[in-house]
Amino acid sequence: MDQKIQSLPAKKNIALVAHDGKKAALKLWCIKHLNALSEHTLYATGTTGHLINKTTGLDVIQLLSGPMGGDQQLGAKIAEHEIHMLVFFWDPLASQPHDPDVKALLRLAAVWNIPVACNEVSADMLLSSPLMNVELERTLPDYEKYLATRQIDI
């Protein structure tokens, strides 16, 4: 598939997600990085967003709870280029009833070329990157061009 270039703004839209067993770790990470996170627009699945807002005072756009469709809402926002970074503290040792939604979310992050942090260290590295607060370009699949050239025989 052909590629196109898209600019990401200096002020990023960051999605915050955590499985139940990792919510405390994400909360502490948000407290640790309160100042840096306040410079960006934050999105989160419902329970996680409520917890972060309540404990940090950060403004968080809260979607549905992950198992109730919040993971899919975030996936749609990634596909629509509204999310620029995903911080997802997932629990690799616990089975999740919405595992297919989680896999779809991570797949969309890979398709649309957004950085993903799955634990505190990777999230620290992304947030402290010199690219975090500057405009930057990324390559994306050129889906519109693909659709324009696609032929379907009926």
From Swiss-Prot:
Coiled coil: none annotated. Its EC number is 4.2.3.3. InterPro entries: Methylgl_synth, Methylglyoxal_synth_AS, MGS-like_dom, MGS-like_dom_sf. It catalyses: dihydroxyacetone phosphate = methylglyoxal + phosphate. Residues 6-154 form the MGS-like domain. PROSITE patterns: METHYLGLYOXAL_SYNTH (PS01335), MGS (PS51855). Substrate binds at residues 19, 23, 45-48, 65-66, 98. It is an enzyme of class 4 (lyase). It comes from the Bacteria. GO terms for biological process: methylglyoxal biosynthetic process. GO terms for cellular component: cytosol. Pfam families: MGS. Keywords: Lyase. The active site is at 71 (proton donor/acceptor). One of its GO terms (molecular function) is methylglyoxal synthase activity. Catalyzes the formation of methylglyoxal from dihydroxyacetone phosphate. Belongs to the methylglyoxal synthase family. This is Methylglyoxal synthase.
